[in-house]
Curated annotation (Swiss-Prot):
Protein name, UniProt field: Adenylate kinase
GO molecular function: adenylate kinase activity; ATP binding; zinc ion binding
Catalyzed reactions per annotation: AMP + ATP = 2 ADP
Enzyme Commission code(s) on record: 2.7.4.3
Gene: adk
Organism name: Caldanaerobacter subterraneus subsp. tengcongensis (strain DSM 15242 / JCM 11007 / NBRC 100824 / MB4) (Thermoanaerobacter tengcongensis)
Pathway note: Purine metabolism; AMP biosynthesis via salvage pathway; AMP from ADP: step 1/1
Alphabetical UniProt keywords: ATP-binding, Cytoplasm, Kinase, Metal-binding, Nucleotide biosynthesis, Nucleotide-binding, Transferase, Zinc
Family to which the UniProt record says this protein belongs: Belongs to the adenylate kinase family.
Length: 221
């Protein structure tokens, strides 16, 4: 099973990715994680990526493709994988198709988790984290016992700069601009499945499972 997972910030993509990987016994490949791994291990590809990052430049598709493909060549990906954070544009999507085709494979499905914009903003801006022990809270859905104080260590909670309204709106705009062409691309290929991400975590996961196990309607509500 070879799956790409799409979804805006705040859609619960990370949570669903872990559940999918466990359920179908396939590796969850997050591009952020493999980039960090290559940088940590000081690999040739890591060094190449770092040259661009140190200059404040975007890592070119060619380097990103190689980093992802290097990971997909590993033994644990032989029976499938779940890609999260890649592809991000049409050239990357075309390269992934070519890479898989050369090995006699193709994508099983592209899962697109959809959540209403206001709900996304609410989910993200409500997050609070403990800068000391790393515990996470949400002011509406999982607040601390004492307002703005960590239950575990008593430290004052903070809102990360990424979770502030202005930053969230910008991140969503970037995501929408980046992802719309991809959604069109995979829709034309007949492998995109839209999942209603406004439901509970378990309900969303059940819908994803249905899609991956053969209930391949364009949208699952």
């Amino acid at each position: 099973m070879r799956v790409v997972l799409l979804g805006p910030p705040g859609a619960g993509k990370g949570t669903q990715a872990l559940k999918i990987a466990k359920e179908f016994d396939i590796p969850h490949i997050s591009t952020g994680d493999i980039f960090r791994q290559n940088l940590r291990d000081n690999t040739e590809l890591g060094k190449l990526a770092k040259e661009y990052m140190d200059k404040g430049l975007l890592v070119p598709d060619e380097v990103t493709n190689r980093i992802v493909e290097d990971r997909l060549e590993k033994e644990d990906c032989k029976k499938g994988f779940l890609l999260d954070g890649y592809p991000r544009n049409i050239p990357q999507a075309e390269e992934l198709d070519k890479f898989l085709e050369e090995r006699g494979h193709s994508l099983t499905a592209v899962i697109n988790i959809q959540v209403e914009r206001e709900a996304l903003i609410d989910r993200i801006t409500g997050r609070r984290v403990c800068p000391v022990c790393g515990a996470t809270y949400h002011i509406k859905t999982s607040p601390p016992k004492v307002d703005n104080v960590c239950d575990k260590c008593g430290s004052e909670l903070i809102q990360r700069s990424d979770d502030k309204l202005e930053s969230v709106v910008k991140r969503l705009e970037v995501y929408e601009k980046e992802t719309k062409p991809l959604i069109d691309y995979y829709t034309k290929k007949g492998i995109l499945v839209n999942i209603d991400g406004n439901k509970s975590i378990d309900e969303v996961f059940e819908d994803i499972k249905k899609a991956l196990l053969g209930d391949r309607r364009d949208d699952i509500h």
